[in-house]
Each structure stands twice: as structure tokens, then as C-alpha cells.
Design a protein with these regions (language model features):
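N-terminal small-domain helix-loop-helix segment of the aminotransferase-like
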Residues: 1-76, 84, 133, 261, ...
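Helix C-cap/helix->beta junction micro-motif
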Residues: 8, 113, 172-173, 288, ...
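Conserved PLP-anchoring active-site segment centered on the Schiff-base-forming lysine
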Residues: 88-110
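A short helix-loop-beta submotif of the ANL/AMP-binding
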Residues: 111-118
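Active-site phosphate-binding strand-loop segment of PLP-dependent enzymes
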Residues: 122-191
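PLP-dependent enzyme catalytic core of the Aspartate aminotransferase-like
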Residues: 135-136, 311, 319-328, 334-368
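PLP-dependent aminotransferase class I/II
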Residues: 205-297
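Conserved PLP-binding catalytic core of the aspartate aminotransferase-like
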Residues: 274-275, 288-324
Length: 368
């Protein structure tokens, strides 16, 4: 879809590349680190300034206290953290529950490791947790749950009440909980991001995964992190080292500078900015006759595109690109069992001029 979008000169709202401006302190410190010679391998768990900055950030924003020496692992992106943790803690044949719609990387990682993903659908429309469905999906082979909050692709933000219910089941069945909190600062309309590890009884069983790719608009730098009980960190760190060695050294320094130097207002202002972007794209989708499911967080919108010609979501995506010049992802990428054929995902992490152009194209103005 990206290649075809480039060919026709359209606007790419398919990829979650986040091409907004990188905060100046992050860029400056990374460049300095390169010139200072910080271009070789780091410790497998990352440089001390970044681990310490992550620990301070977690205490301030997530109300989670961790030891930067024994409970923080800098990873080559959040996805690398998930891969290493799955390698370390799960076995072929284990079952792991994903909430649907899901992020495709989670599903494909489990499949690659011969672990069985079990999809538990969230309620259509408002994406509420169906506790009965979740309870029914747990079997003697269930080893873990994956919670992506705020979520890609639907912007689901799990409420504290929902997470407490999940935590109770995790305790009852002795399950790991893998979180993906990469969009933690992209939460709208006064909602609260709750880190599952902060709930009673969850610290030891939760593998908390996040990163700075989205927050600092550095998706190509591959800087993520993982926190967990020291009991699990040795094995997780071993598999991350075996697979990735370490996250890029100079980019670790740049990321640490961002965490240390940027004020709290940076994060609140960013949430307000992205809420405005969300409102802009949702308004354009409504005007185009494509009904959006307004996201509570993250920076994607799932929209009902049943009015577009085409028998499948991929055909509808091609129709939209051909007729309106806007690229989106087929909804079937986020569902099992043939669901999602009438859905497309749009990413609104774009510069304002690009997003405005996409909205104009969706409305039928200025077609390519």
C-alpha cells in the first residue's frame, strides 16, 4: 500500500511512522554522543543514564517503583522486548490470550514461536472488555495475557475497573501479563492510563513493555524498554542480548536526554495536540461517509468503510487510494476469523499540513 501510495502521490495514513518533529534535546544529545565516540555496544541492559531516567519517569508518571540496576532492560524497540520476554517465559504449545482487535506483531511473534494465540473479542463499537468471554477463553494451557493499552488499532484504553478484573483472573490462574504501553501518553478526553503492574498482586507477574518511538517521534531509532521482577529479568535479558545485542548506543543517549530535560508539559501538550488531530480526521471520515470508531487513545482510527466498493477490506483500501488518494490498512490485519472486512485503519500521527491534505482528499477536494 505504501509503494502504491507513493506512486500516485497520495497521503499515507497506513503506516504508524509518526513523522512529526523530534524534540530538539533528543536530536542534539544523540549527535553529541556520536561525536563523543559512543558508537559501540553498550551493556546488554542499556546505558545507566537511560535506565535511571526510565526509572524516574516510571515513578513520576506510572506510579511504579523499579530498580534501574535490576528491573529495567533497554530494548531494540518495544517489539524486541515482547519477543525476548516471550522467548524467555513461554514454551511452544502454550496459549496466550490477545484482545481483539490486536496489534499484528503480537500475534505473529507468538505464531513464530509456536505459541498458540487465543483471540478474545472486545465488544463491537465501544471495545469494552467482555469478562465472560475472557474467563471462557482460559484453559489449563493458558500461560499469559497480552494487554495493549492504549491500543493499536482501535485506541482502546483499558479502565482501572477492567484491569482490576483482568488482574483477578491472572492471579486466580497464575498467568503472566505482558503489557504494551507504547502509547501511554496518547490518552484523550481526560482518561487515565493505568499501568497494570501497579495493581495489587500484579508486580511479580507483569512484564511491562513500552518505549520512546512514539513519544519522541523516533520510530526508526528502536529504543524501547521493559521492566519486570528481577526473577525474570536474567532470562529476558539473555534472549534480548542473543537476538539484538543492544539498542543503538547514541540513540540511547538522545532518549535519556529527552526523559531528563523535557518538562511534564511536553507530554500533556502532546496529548492535547493529538486529540485535535484525532478530531480532525474523525470529522473528515464522517464527511466522507466512513463512520469512525472514535479512539480513546493512541493515534489510529478504525472506520466502517462498508459504503466503499469492494468485497474485501483490501479491495476497499485500494478503492480509497485510487479514488481519494489516501492510504489505509485493511481491518482484517487486526482480527481473526474473517472479521474486519468492512474496516480500515487510519493513522493520524502526521504533520498538520499532511493530515489536513488527507482530510481534504477524504472529503473529495483536491484529488490527486
Amino acid at each position: 500500500m505504501t509503494v502504491e501510495c507513493d506512486r500516485v502521490g497520495g497521503v499515507n495514513l497506513a503506516q504508524g511512522v509518526c513523522d512529526t518533529e523530534v524534540p530538539p534535546p533528543v536530536v542534539r544529545r544523540a549527535i553529541e554522543a556520536i561525536h563523543e565516540g559512543n558508537n559501540i555496544y553498550t551493556r546488554l541492559d542499556g546505558i545507566a543514564p537511560l535506565r535511571e531516567a526510565i526509572a524516574r519517569k516510571l515513578e513520576r508518571d506510572n506510579h511504579l517503583t523499579v530498580d534501574p540496576e535490576s528491573e529495567v532492560l533497554v530494548t531494540s524497540g518495544a517489539t524486541a522486548g515482547f519477543y525476548a520476554a516471550a522467548l524467555a517465559l513461554l514454551d511452544p504449545g502454550d496459549e496466550v490470550i490477545l484482545f481483539e482487535p490486536f496489534y499484528g506483531y503480537h500475534l505473529n511473534t507468538l505464531l513464530a514461536l509456536r505459541i498458540k494465540p487465543v483471540a478474545v473479542p472486545l465488544a463491537d463499537g465501544n471495545w469494552a472488555l467482555d469478562l465472560d468471554r475472557l474467563r471462557a477463553a482460559i484453559t489449563p494451557k493458558t500461560r499469559a495475557l497480552v494487554i495493549n493499552t492504549p491500543g493499536n488499532p482501535c485506541g482502546k484504553v483499558f479502565s482501572r475497573t477492567e484491569l482490576e478484573a483482568v488482574a483477578a483472573l491472572a492471579e486466580e490462574h497464575d498467568l503472566f501479563v505482558f503489557t504494551d504501553e507504547i502509547y501511554e501518553y496518547f490518552v484523550f478526553d481526560g482518561r487515565e492510563h493505568v499501568s497494570p503492574a501497579t495493581l495489587p498482586g500484579m508486580a511479580e507477574r507483569t512484564i511491562s513493555i513500552s518505549g520512546l518511538s512514539k513519544t519522541f517521534s523516533i520510530t526508526g531509532w528502536r529504543i524501547g524498554y521493559l521492566t519486570a521482577n528481577p526473577r525474570w529479568m536474567g532470562a529476558i535479558g539473555y534472549f534480548h542480548d542473543l537476538t539484538y545485542v543492544c539498542a543503538p548506543s547514541p540513540f540511547q543517549y538522545g532518549s535519556a536526554a529527552g526523559l531528563m530535560e523535557l518538562p511534564v508539559s511536553f507530554y500533556t501538550d502532546m496529548a492535547a495536540e493529538y486529540q485535535a488531530k484525532r478530531d480532525l480526521i474523525c470529522s473528515a471520515l464522517v464527511d466522507a461517509g466512513l463512520t469512525p470508531s472514535v479512539p480513546a487513545g493512541a493515534y489510529y482510527v478504525l472506520a466502517d468503510v462498508s459504503s466503499l466498493p469492494g468485497a474485501t477490506a483490501k479491495e476497499k483500501a485500494r478503492t480509497l487510494l485510487r479514488e481519494r488518494g489516501v492510504a489505509a490498512v485493511a481491518g482484517t490485519a487486526f482480527f481473526t476469523g474473517g472479521r474486519g472486512e468492512n474496516l480500515l485503519r487510519f493513522c493520524f500521527a502526521k504533520r498538520d499540513d499532511d493530515l489536513k491534505r488527507a482530510c481534504d482528499l477524504l472529503r473529495g477536494a483536491g484529488r490527486v
